[in-house]
A protein has these predicted regions:
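Bacterial N-terminal signal peptides
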Residues: 1-6
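N-proximal helix/coil linker or "cap" segments that precede and/or mark the start of modular domains
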Residues: 7-28
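A short beta-strand-turn-helix
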Residues: 30-49
């Protein structure tokens, strides 16, 4: 007899944080990116933005991150802010994963859940597409993982 286990997200988690939805405003936060830039919710209100939470050992995140690099390559030159924030991940593991996958986009290594819990309680990857002014217009989780095309379509809809 076979036993099948269905997992919710990469890791079974207890709900402890916020659960931002479409129409909500980005919460107050500040992170320092790997390129030294400080990003805040106030800065993200100045343009269309994408915020993604990830962990490098999460299989779903491992699938989505290379797609996010393609999104970054296409939209960052157009002034769209793409902000990747780790959840309980180390700078070393992120650097190693970035090098292994050939990723170039900046990220913010967070070794705890303080920033993540301002956005969500459970599930990664988690991708927020936000309009100018900091209002969330799309939320993608691992149910199912967002594709490159879905993220681009969301961005195009918000840009219009």
């Amino acid at each position: 007899m076979a036993v099948v286990t269905v997992l919710s997200g990469c890791i079974k988690e207890k709900q402890t944080g916020a659960d931002l939805k479409v129409g909500d405003r980005l919460p107050d936060f500040e992170v320092v990116m790997s390129d030294g830039e400080t990003v805040t919710d106030q800065i993200l209100q100045e343009s269309v933005s994408v915020v993604m939470f990830f962990h490098t050992s999460c299989p779903d995140c491992q699938q989505v991150l290379p797609q996010m690099q393609s999104v970054y390559d296409e939209y960052a030159p157009k002034g769209i802010r793409i902000v990747l924030i780790s959840r309980e991940d180390t700078e070393e593991s992120i650097e190693s994963f970035w090098q292994e996958k050939g990723l170039k986009m900046p990220y913010s290594a967070q070794n705890d859940r303080k920033i993540y819990e301002k956005f969500a309680a459970t599930r990664i990857p988690r991708v927020y597409v936000n309009e100018k002014g900091g209002i969330i217009r799309y939320v993608f989780t691992d149910d199912p993982n967002p594709s490159y095309d879905e993220i681009c379509t969301a961005l195009e809809n918000v840009i219009r």
